[in-house]
Amino acid sequence: MRPGKKLLAVCVLCSLASGCATLDVPREPSQVLPATGSVFGRSIHAQAAPYQGRSGFRLLSNSTEAFTARAELIRNAQTSLDLQYYIVHDGVSTRMLVEELLKAADRGVRVRILLDDTTSDGLDTIIATLAAHPQIQIRLFNPLHLGRSTGVTRAAGRLFNLSLQHRRMHNKLFLADNSVAIVGGRNLGDEYFDAEPNLNFTDIDMLSVGPVAEQLGHSFDQYWNSALSKPIDEFLSSKPSIKDLQNTRTRLEESLDETRKQNHALYQQLMTFKTAPRMDIWRKELIWAWNQALWDAPSKVLAKDEPDPQLLLTTQLASELRGVSKELIMISAYFVPGQPGLVYLTGRADAGVSVSLLTNSLEATDVPAVHGGYAPYRKALLEHGVKLYELRRQPGDNYGSGPHLFYSKSFRGSDSSLHSKAMIFDRQKAFIGSFNFDPRSVLWNTEVGVLVDSPELAGHVRELALQGMAPALSYQAKLQDGKIVWVTEDNGQMHTLTQEPGSWWRRFNAWFSTTVGLERML
């Protein structure tokens, strides 16, 4: 998801204070704590030992599991929690996680939270209130240094420094005791956990246990200790006090109690991490495999133009992309191949590789402008035999029942949009992370993910992709008499559409992004 909403991480009732930039304050580097420093970490270490360097993986393919896993990791953590996110939106799910983070800090767990600066727009004081806890540290990545006080000055500041400010930290990482991590496409917010009344994102996360978590810990440290990461209190004229934090906690408790009374079903659904914990069960279901954690260097965002290839996640993934020989399946919520991607995909298809892509349709995407960057490439891709599947808008239950992707219907009748990012190479390896197949992920934003060498795990991810490509869920774009048509299924009957589904406003947004040449920024 692209930025557009604002974060309210803890206390929607707190008042905002004007912020100002201050001089950089010298700070000590900080590293992940040893995985063996806690009982939980040692239990993971003992579980992983027989697998001789392999790590354990389990997909979290539905929103309930994804939320429960995060909440349970906070509860299990004994020494450290490291969170790195592009977007954190206010909502019931976020408030529950914040409450658990505060409880973890109370019992002595060190909590480090690294947020992309766009998350904090206009909310520095609110976010910084959390950091008043002695066990919680919060930093912002690639922050705007001047003009933070109002929305207007922030917009102006980003515009005047656009070459740096459009480059964002898109990473999503959740790490407990340097032993268990969650990677994937989900940010934090109700729309990612099936708790938002207007939109639910269909996504894939992966529970990652053992040595891979330590690799991801190194990734977190690189970003945390980067010169681009600044403590949030550097942007405040005065720091929130312990009393401010206590007031926030009181309001947080009142808010969650109100949710319990007013929306008891949703409250109970999210609280299953307390009533029916699953972590011990999931640990027995892990797939143990060789793997590689991949991430962009934080300094990628400092490049004057295109970054040095040595800094890029895609360079680390290049051997897999080049080496695929039989089947390549890609899931990318935002897909803009550009000329290099077009050459790569058509080249693989021409070499006899079965290439299939699942992305959002125009009617389903939350960013129609990105669809405008994808649409001009469809015909060339289809001419070379690349199979294109565009996920249909999946209406919530208020709009009728029907098939839904990844075995999940929205709890509150919300429409669903694809937000997943994954690749499957020759049914042997799977890559899951925050990376979209578009110029923004390749060149401008930073990303993180894990490549797993396991036919079993690759098979699970492939099954999810094929489910999404089913004609009842997606439009398959095809060529008919030289023109693109969309083949789909309704009520068991196949039919062909000659006009792309989507409202006139979505069409206009897609057309506009193409017309003004935004592709390289998408």
Locate the predicted segments by residue.
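Charged, low-complexity intrinsically disordered terminal segments
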Residues: 5, 19-172, 176-522
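Bacterial N-terminal signal peptides
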Residues: 9-18
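Bacterial N-terminal signal peptides that target proteins for export
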Residues: 1-8
